[in-house]
Amino acid sequence: LADVRAEAARIAMRRRVTLTLEETMRAAAAPSATAWQARWAAAVQALGLPAFTLPSGAGHDAMKLHEAMPQAMLFVRGLNAGISHNPLESVTNDDCDLAVRAFTHLTEQLAADLS
């Protein structure tokens, strides 16, 4: 964080603008629910694909959602070196199709479990 602040200060000085940095929120990473991770893994594996786990400390909606209910995320492989939350973020149609199919499988399993 110190490196980012220092670079921002250099840029502001070079551009002759005033820079004010203020922390407005701090939240710990949201733990994913083990049962939901297992549901996602089963949905991905049902497509004949391996399921991988990925820790994420990013500021996703899950940081607040997990306070109200269990959560887990399905990450879709990204192009452009995996850049995320940026206009350069990109995914393939095939990977989006796989994500939708995994989601469909997960929701169908939930419906079956409830009936």
Regions found by a protein language model. Name each.
Residues 1-9:
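Short amphipathic alpha-helices in soluble, non-transmembrane regions
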Residues 3-4, 36, 95, 99-102:
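Hydrophobic alpha-helical membrane-association signature
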Residues 10-23, 50-55, 112-115:
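Flexible, glycine/charged-enriched surface loops at secondary-structure junctions
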Residues 13, 45, 66:
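Anion (oxyanion) recognition and catalysis
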Residues 17-37, 56-63:
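A short beta-alpha structural unit
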Residues 42-49:
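Short, basic, glycine/proline-bearing loop/turn elements
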Residues 50-100:
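Zn-dependent metallopeptidase/amidohydrolase metal-coordination segment
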Residues 102-113:
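C-terminal alpha-helix
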